[in-house]
Amino acid sequence: MRLSEILAVALVTGATAYDLPDNLKQIYEKHKGKCSKVYQKGFTNGGHSDGKSFEYCGDIEGAIFMHSSAKGGQYTNMDVDCDGANNSAGKCSNDPSGQGVTAFKDEVKKFGIPDLDANLHPYIVFGNEEHSPQFKPQKYGMEPLSVMAVVCNGKLHYGIWGDTNGGTSTGEASLSMAELCFPEEKPDGDHGHDDNDVLYIGFTGKDAVPGKSANWKAKKTEDFEDSIKSIGDKLVAGLKA
């Protein structure tokens, strides 16, 4: 699906989100296909139709993103992750693989919460551990709990790098991020977004870390996202197509 088609869908759904700046529109169209700086390849999107064609790419200066060269070039999907605090609450109650802890539980406890809550915090699962191939974003300069940009449904949202995958699949985010991106699809713990049209961008460097400035104790997802928006806007503005 081309960005113009996705934008049309977003207008129909009326989802509250941020408009894509021009540089991000150009990035979205430009980086689907080939990657000249492959950090690690051989991953799936959690399914079988596109094989192990997904890879972490460093072609955008100061950033890391996921893409696949299959089918002429594409990004990845958005499976729902419910790991962390309240992992069986609300729409996460039917998650077949939920765990009661995220990868950065110890770090986020410093901000007065027991762990990230997938029902509340819009986090992205980024990086792969335990199985081969592996990819550790920290090796390339990403910091735990740093701001990430997500292009979904023709719009821009901000989340944080909040978890890693124990296998070799990619394209996963918390329930609250899926609800921000695709409210019309009514995601839950066992149902996400299948199309490979979601661009996840991680940023390198400590400037991407919100720390105490993020509203970790927010009661609404939108309030948390709003608390990291200024950092996200600055990071996105610095990206070159």
UniProtKB/Swiss-Prot annotation:
Reactions this protein catalyses: Endohydrolysis of beta-(1->4)-linkages between D-glucosamine residues in a partly acetylated chitosan
Keywords: Carbohydrate metabolism, Glycoprotein, Glycosidase, Hydrolase, Polysaccharide degradation, Secreted, Signal
Pfam family, one: Glyco_hydro_75
Glycan attachment residues as annotated in the record: 86
Enzyme Commission number(s): 3.2.1.132
GO cellular component: extracellular region
Biological process, per Gene Ontology: polysaccharide catabolic process
UniProt GO MF annotations: chitosanase activity
Signal peptide: 1-17
Protein's cellular compartments: Secreted
Biological role: Chitosanase catalyzing the endo-type cleavage of chitosan, the deacylated form of chitin. Chitosanase may be crucial in the degradation of the deacetylated portion of chitin in the fungal cell wall. Chitoolisaccharides produced by the hydrolysis of partially N-acetylated chitosan are known to have many biological activities, including antibacterial activity, immune-enhancing effects, and elicitor activity.
Annotated family: Belongs to the glycosyl hydrolase 75 family.
Annotated protein name in UniProt: Endo-chitosanase B
UniProt source species: Aspergillus oryzae (strain ATCC 42149 / RIB 40)
Gene (UniProt): csnB
